[in-house]
From Swiss-Prot:
Disulfide bonds: none annotated. It comes from Anaplasma phagocytophilum (strain HZ). Keywords: Cell inner membrane, Cell membrane, Cytochrome c-type biogenesis, Heme, Iron, Membrane, Metal-binding, Signal-anchor, Transmembrane, Transmembrane helix. Heme chaperone required for the biogenesis of c-type cytochromes. Transiently binds heme delivered by CcmC and transfers the heme to apo-cytochromes in a process facilitated by CcmF and CcmH. GO terms for molecular function: heme binding; metal ion binding. Heme binds at residues 121, 125. This is Cytochrome c-type biogenesis protein CcmE.
């Protein structure tokens, strides 16, 4: 083979290999995509949850937490719409009423089935080991 043909073949094989690697990386990354929406957005467009798991966030509604053995059912709200969530697993330590929560899962027949659950805290969070006087000192620095 002539030098010119070898160079063309090398470039062509390189582009094909690069394309295959790029396609593989994009395919693998698409598995980890999870979109975020509010309960109002999810109820308005339930198709969002059909292809990929999504994250939905809001405040846990007072009086909505019901435990069933190792699973829990509760409602979250964005102050517009309430969404029923079912979760099976270990609850986060800060989980409770009037606490922000983010659930990752799928929306099936009007109920959000969560695979992961995170409890949020506000930016003023202080660990219990600090007293209120320590918090004042830390907050002023």
């Amino acid at each position: 083979m002539q030098r010119k043909h070898k160079r063309i073949l090398f470039v062509a094989v390189s582009f094909i290999a690069l394309g295959c690697v790029s396609a593989f990386v994009l395919f693998e990354l698409s598995k980890s995509i999870s979109f975020f929406c509010t309960p109002t957005e999810l109820v308005a467009d339930p198709i969002k949850s059909s292809r990929y798991p999504i994250r939905v966030g809001g405040m846990i509604v007072k009086g909505s937490i019901v435990r069933h053995g190792d699973s829990v059912t509760f409602s979250i709200t964005d102050l517009g719409t309430e969404l029923e969530v079912t979760y099976r697993g270990v609850l986060p330590p800060m989980f409770g009423e009037d606490v922000g929560a983010i659930a990752k899962g799928r929306f099936v027949d009007g109920v959000f089935i969560a695979e992961e659950l995170l409890a949020k805290h506000d930016e003023k969070y202080m660990p219990k080991k600090y007293s209120s006087s320590d918090a004042a000192v830390i907050g002023s620095s």
